[in-house]
Regions:
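Amphipathic protein-protein interaction modules
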Residues: 86-141
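N-terminal amphipathic/basic-hydrophobic helices that include classical n-h-c signal peptides
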Residues: 1-19
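Amphipathic alpha-helical packing elements
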Residues: 57-99
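Amphipathic secondary-structure elements and adjacent low-complexity, charged linkers
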Residues: 13-14, 18, 25-29, 104
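Alpha-helix initiation and N-capping motif
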Residues: 40-43, 79, 92, 112
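Polar/charged low-complexity regulatory segments
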Residues: 21-58, 118-166
Length: 166
């Protein structure tokens, strides 16, 4: 018989572990928002930005930006709760297990797939943001007619920001 209180999902670790797992986003971009973890888009990029933010190596990348908000609204998690769990030093798989266990909005695999597919096609939906998007495409390469959505822009901007040619 085990009368001890349940252990926390992840024991606290030295913050140097978080720094060791963090990407330096001043030297390379986070993962594409298209990369999936447990079916979720955005999550791997979000974890990269969270780890880099904690390590002070996030550069121009902002944790909990509007794109990240799609993930938080879909799962019901708060940015603060996820960031607190990232501090544990957990890797991607353990973070996914934590998300699935602690997300207030429990989603089926089909719901996650449909949401992820939607995020890959979502575009800027108000006039001001569409104008901003158009200006950004002009800045990156006005000849690019293949750029339609948020993920297209983020992928290209990441590429160009680190020396690529659009």
């Amino acid at each position: 018989r085990n009368d001890e209180a349940a252990l926390p999902a992840f024991a606290p670790v030295d913050e140097s572990l978080v720094a060791m797992n963090a990407l330096n986003l001043t030297q390379r971009p986070p993962r594409s928002p298209r990369v999936r973890l447990g079916g979720y888009t955005i999550l791997p990029r979000l974890l990269d930005k969270a780890r880099a933010t904690l390590a002070g190596t996030n550069g121009d990348y902002i944790y909990n930006n509007p794109n990240d908000g799609h993930f938080f609204r879909f799962t019901g998690l708060t940015p603060e709760a996820l960031l607190e769990q990232v501090k544990s030093g957990a890797g991607d798989w353990d973070m996914l297990l934590w998300v699935n266990e602690h997300a207030p909005l429990k989603r089926t695999a089909l719901e996650i797939q449909q949401w992820a597919d939607w995020t890959e096609s979502v575009s800027f939906n108000d006039v001001e943001m569409r104008e901003w998007f158009t200006d950004q495409i002009k800045r990156l390469n006005p000849a690019r007619e293949d750029l339609r959505g948020t993920f297209d822009y983020l992928d290209l901007d990441d590429f160009v920001s680190f020396g690529g040619v659009a």
